[in-house]
Amino acid sequence: MLRFIARRLVSSIPVLFGILLATFVIGRLIPGDPCQAALQERATPERCEEFNSEYGFDDPIFVQFGSYVGDVFRGDLGNSVQERQSVTDLLIDRLPVTLQLAVAALVIAVVVGVPLGVLAGSRHNSKTDVATIVGANLGVSIPVFVLALILQYVFALQLDDTPLGLPASGQLTAGVIPEPFYEVWGIGQNSLFEFIANIDLLNAVLIWRWDIFVDALQHLILPAVALATIPMAIIARMTRSSLLDVLGLDYVRTARAKGLRERVVITRHALRNSLLPVVTVIGLSLGTLVGGAILTETIFNLTGVGKTLFDAITGRDYFVVQGFTLVVAFGFVVVNLITDIVYTFLDPKVRVS
């Protein structure tokens, strides 16, 4: 298993290098001047000359790329032109926000999507099946930003004074400033602890503040549901389609011929094999979540990876674009690796070798 993981990680290096090269080139092709974007009205010729010299923008393009690749191998992702801090510090601050949102959305998508698909597939051509298909098609068709605005209008405005009311913002309630767990525990501070402390739900559990946990959860529900809708619909459709295919196989018909109840046939015989393609879809859903996070974070006022990337692209903050894209790409590699490992447990015919 360890050799398999190491082999997959090594084979991913060319992919990551290609992504690094692509983001570097595309970033330089975007029209505009990074000095003008960063300094705006303060961008005099003298200041721009100092600015370009400080960040290496006056070097030849190949020298810039070589310097950046060397810095990456040393663990240095560069410094943000707009934020005036290291990209690593920005990641520690912004990535936990997106990670919490993406995990919550993925959990909702799987917990709701898989049972809906199983229910529809096990009752083929019934009203439940038709309703699931219509709902899934509708879920795929609605843009994330439209659904986000609808959710805000319904739950944050129309139902605000009812028990169903939810906050329109994804941030904690104003004035709620939780202490980092490492300060409460009296242990040393490091980058990993800062990263964990920036995950509101996890930090609230670690400091045993359930009032903060509930507040964070309430602010997370609407953006997570908005982000989860498209992958949830895709997972439901794939689960239904895969289950219908498996239910038509000989071994399932044999199980039915033995007099087994339909619930036993589905749960013990058909479901496991029907989940194989669903696992792949769940892994690929990460791309949908990252892409949708840009709009979701903007609408719900969350400062995560998506919003930071959008601001970096519009502000020509090369190092942030390259650093964040590289980290997200590495996340894709890890997710694909986990997907392959899960395959080996679900299907005995698939071997790690």
Model-derived segments and their meaning:
Residues 1-2, 58-63, 76-88, 121-124, ...:
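Short, membrane-interfacial amphipathic segments enriched in basic
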Residues 1-60, 88-92, 119, 127-145, ...:
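N-terminal signal-anchor/first transmembrane alpha helix
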Residues 2-3, 95-128, 144, 177-353:
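Alpha-helical transmembrane segments of integral membrane proteins
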Residues 12, 72, 98, 102, ...:
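Short alpha-helical functional segments enriched in proximate histidine and acidic residues
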Residues 15-66, 155-212:
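Hydrophobic alpha-helical transmembrane segments of membrane transport/permease proteins
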Residues 36, 58-114:
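An internal, D/E-rich "acidic patch" concept
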